[in-house]
Regions:
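Conserved phosphate-donor/acceptor-positioning beta-strand/loop module used by diverse small-molecule
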Residues: 143, 154-179
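PAPS-dependent sulfation machinery
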Residues: 38-140
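Glycine-rich phosphate-binding P-loop
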Residues: 7-26
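Nucleotide 5′-phosphate-binding alpha/beta core
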Residues: 1-7
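PAPS-dependent sulfotransferases, especially Golgi type II membrane carbohydrate sulfotransferases
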Residues: 1, 104-121, 128, 132-135, ...
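Short His-Asn-centered micro-motif
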Residues: 9-11, 141-145, 229
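Flexible, glycine/threonine-enriched loop-and-boundary segments that flank and lead into catalytic domains
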Residues: 127, 133-160
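Post-Walker A helix-loop "phosphate-sensing" segment adjacent to the P-loop in P-loop NTPases
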Residues: 25-35
Length: 296
């Protein structure tokens, strides 16, 4: 059984990745490692991963990607061994906002907005049961901006879920969101560039927040916790402690130490955040963004 799993969600670039990896560092928790999202199977002992051919294949791909795109690691560090979003599990059912975040696909976006995601989350749950077979006693910690679009399906599948929503003024992150989409898809399309990326991002993410806010109002507020991005950056471990306190969880000394190590690693070397961008690059202004997201 999967009991009281933690789901981190929020707009892209609001600190979801940093918070997810901090929470996942707790030895009492388990998360979705990139290679197991790609190749779902019962999680083998950590010391055997480097000899697993599937792990080695994906690790080699990321090593090549890092070498060919040295600037990308500072935007969003990815590796076969790292905790990652559960978008790959939802993609198994073709229900994922990642598609419209990486291409101009208005007909797909329209189709997705009318779908019931519940079967996708049931499959998501079965994947977690498979992957966590050897660690059934550990609490799952998961993260995906797609959860904004399907809270009802998530709660129907995981009725005791603990949901953490991250927040940051949208006008300060929209350019960053667009820049990430641009760098991820460089050379893929002549359509999904510049102002088209900006327009699509505005449509997609305003719709997601509208849906999430409307759905959230129906559930027990005790199952939700809000994190301000600036609080997370100023005091990462203090923010985590507040989350544990709200949900009645125990934060052990071992967990604190592991989180301290993870935070230090995230600020160093290739992982250190490096990002420059402008709203004007994507046909947007601060006023346009504020107007679209007013009240969300």
């Amino acid at each position: 059984a999967i009991k009281r799993p933690i789901f981190v969600t929020g707009l892209v670039r609001t600190g979801t990745t940093a918070l997810h990896r901090l929470l996942g560092a707790d030895p009492a928790h388990q998360g979705l490692h990139m290679w197991l999202a790609e190749y779902p199977q019962p999680r083998p002992p950590r010391e055997t991963w480097e000899s697993n051919p599937l792990y080695r294949q994906l690790d080699a791909q990321f090593t090549q990607h890092h070498a060919e795109n040295p600037g990308y690691t500072g935007l969003h560090f990815m590796a076969a061994y790292e905790l990652e979003e559960c978008w790959q599990l939802l993609r198994q059912s073709l229900h994922s906002v990642s598609y419209e975040a990486l291409a101009h696909v208005p007909s797909y976006a329209d189709w997705l907005s009318r779908q019931d995601w519940t079967p996708s989350y049931c499959r998501h749950r079965r994947n977690l049961q498979l992957i966590g077979l050897n660690d059934a006693e550990k609490r799952w910690v998961l993260k995906n901006p797609s959860h904004l679009f399907a809270l009802d399906a998530l709660m129907a599948t995981y009725p005791d879920a603990l949901v953490v929503q991250t927040h940051r003024p949208v006008e300060t992150i929209m350019a960053s969101m667009c820049s990430l989409a641009q760098h991820t898809t460089e050379g893929w399309s002549t359509k999904f560039v510049g102002a088209q990326i900006g327009a699509d991002a505005m449509d997609t993410w305003s719709r997601g927040l509208e849906r999430f806010n409307a759905a959230r109002a129906k559930y027990d507020s005790a199952q939700f916790y809000d994190v301000d991005y600036h609080d997370l950056i100023a005091d990462p471990l203090g923010t985590v402690a507040d989350i544990y306190r709200h949900f009645g969880l125990t934060l052990s000394d071992e967990a604190r130490q592991a989180m301290t190590t993870v935070h230090a690693e995230s600020q160093s070397g290739a992982r250190a955040p490096k990002h420059s961008y402008s709203l004007a690059d994507y046909g947007l202004t601060v006023e346009m963004v504020k107007e679209r997201f007013a009240g969300l």
